Amino acid sequence: MKQTKTLKVRVKDKHAAQLNRMARSVNFVWNYLNELSARAIRERGLFLSTYDMHPYTKGAGKDLGLHSQTLQEIAREYATRRKQFKKTRLAWRKSGGVRRSLGWIPVNTGAAKWKNGQVFHNGCYFKVWDSYGLSQYKFRSGSFSEDARGRWYFNVVVEVDIQPNQAQGEVGIDLGLTDTA
């Protein structure tokens, strides 16, 4: 029987500068989609779906240093959160300052792979502290995320085989009858 599980592994600190650049680009795309969506609602009274946003971001990945599937994931996440919170406009993702947003880089299924003992995404290799043996898993969707101390993590959904519990042990029930006997 298979079950999905999310694994979180720490990315080595030497990749922080590159991941920060990518996170700034993600924030830029998020803010662009925020403005685009708010303008479409204001001018046409139309909520843009995930697929309506794709033509507006097509080709921007090369200039921003992001994978094309990352742009699609940002649009999907934006549309999901806008619908979840029932807002016409969501908060800006800030890249600098005291109240900046923590780094987040979404990864679509198939955009990240395990190669040569490292995570391969967007033409770059990222070394990680592999405590799970990631080579034995097939990656599904995931993300790179930053914590408050500036450390980066790679979060990925994988399928794992689980063994059903046979439950062959014995269970004893105390009925409390010794007090009444």
Each language-model region and where it sits:
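Nucleic-acid substrate recognition interfaces
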Residues: 1-181
